[in-house]
Amino acid sequence: MEKIPVLVAGALGKMGSEVIKAIYKSNDCELVAAIDNANEMEGVDIGTALGMDQMDVAVTADLEGSLCVASQSVRNSSGNAVLIDFTHPNVVYEHSRASIAYGVHPVIGTTGLSIVQLEELREFANKASIGAAIIPNFSVGMVLLQQAAAAAASFYDYAELTESHHNQKADAPSGTCIKTAEIIEEIGKSFNKTTIKEQESIKGSRGGLRESGLRLHSVRLPGIVAQQQVLFGSPGETYLLSHNTIDRSAYMPGVLHTIRKVRHLKSLVYGLEKIL
């Protein structure tokens, strides 16, 4: 069976290293590039760097060179390579554009893209007829929470969202929290209407306010991987939806599923629910 060639950007990071371990254990994926800007690890076998068996793939900071090699090596194969990106909001947009330009399918797990950047990538991928996926959260459990939140939105007029992550996460609120809010807002109504004029003694105490009236709150602490809560309220009751990621291995089934699916797409999709 021909294996899917996969490049991982952010290979030495928390998520990138988990992805490489999942690829190593899979039967149908093959790591062809481990991209990271950790200069001290340049040229080191990624397997050795992660405390695994050697994988004959050296750590490199050269994204475009890796994309070029991958695009050339698969021209005579049955499908294009896939780039998995878990890097930083400052670089993920350029990484994605470069990947599409080389005919390599980008799967973006890095959050922090602006709405304008997302739409530009959608247009770029669609024009190139290259499948691409922007996935704020690869957890199937999170997809189920979002579906439950969308259903509850019909019955509750008050709702607030809280997301908690480790203190190394650069963007806030998280892409998952924003995506959840967008799914709730698809019902097309306003939330949290009040006749009271609120006054914050400390700016930001009430969280970020969206046009729909939904409020989003962010927590950053060591010891947390990822948590999200959606709290609905009405007179006499509250309804709490909660999801807690204990270990990053929970994301790997979703990552591998996306790798397999994205090569059959001709446009960009946003959200794991679009390809389940």
From Swiss-Prot:
As its record notes, the protein acts as a catalyst of:
(S)-2,3,4,5-tetrahydrodipicolinate + NAD(+) + H2O = (2S,4S)-4-hydroxy-2,3,4,5-tetrahydrodipicolinate + NADH + H(+); (S)-2,3,4,5-tetrahydrodipicolinate + NADP(+) + H2O = (2S,4S)-4-hydroxy-2,3,4,5-tetrahydrodipicolinate + NADPH + H(+)
Q: Where does NAD(+) bind?
A: G10, A11, L12, G13, K14, M15, D36, G109, T110, T111
GO MF terms listed in the record are: 4-hydroxy-tetrahydrodipicolinate reductase; NAD binding; NADP binding; oxidoreductase activity, acting on CH or CH2 groups, NAD or NADP as acceptor
Q: Does the keyword NADP apply?
A: yes
Instruction: Say if the entry is tagged with keyword NADP.
Output: yes
GO-annotated cellular components: cytosol
Cellular compartment(s): Cytoplasm
What keywords sit in the KW lines?
A: Amino-acid biosynthesis, Cytoplasm, Diaminopimelate biosynthesis, Lysine biosynthesis, NAD, NADP, Oxidoreductase
Residues reported to bind (S)-2,3,4,5-tetrahydrodipicolinate: H166, G175, T176
A Pfam family cross-referenced in the UniProt record is DapB_C
Entry's EC annotation? 1.17.1.8
Q: What is its main location?
A: cytoplasm
Pathway(s) of this molecule: Amino-acid biosynthesis; L-lysine biosynthesis via DAP pathway; (S)-tetrahydrodipicolinate from L-aspartate: step 4/4
Active site residues according to the UniProt entry: H165 (proton donor/acceptor), K169 (proton donor)
Highest taxon, organism lineage: Bacteria
Q: Which InterPro entries match?
A: DapB_C, DapB_N, DapB_N_CS, DHDPR_bac, NAD(P)-bd_dom_sf
Intrachain S-S bonds: none
The record ties this protein, via Gene3D superfamilies, to: Dihydrodipicolinate Reductase, domain 2, NAD(P)-binding Rossmann-like Domain
Q: Which GO terms describe its biological process?
A: diaminopimelate biosynthetic process; lysine biosynthetic process via diaminopimelate
The UniProt function text for this chain reads: Catalyzes the conversion of 4-hydroxy-tetrahydrodipicolinate (HTPA) to tetrahydrodipicolinate.
Provide the protein name. Answer: 4-hydroxy-tetrahydrodipicolinate reductase
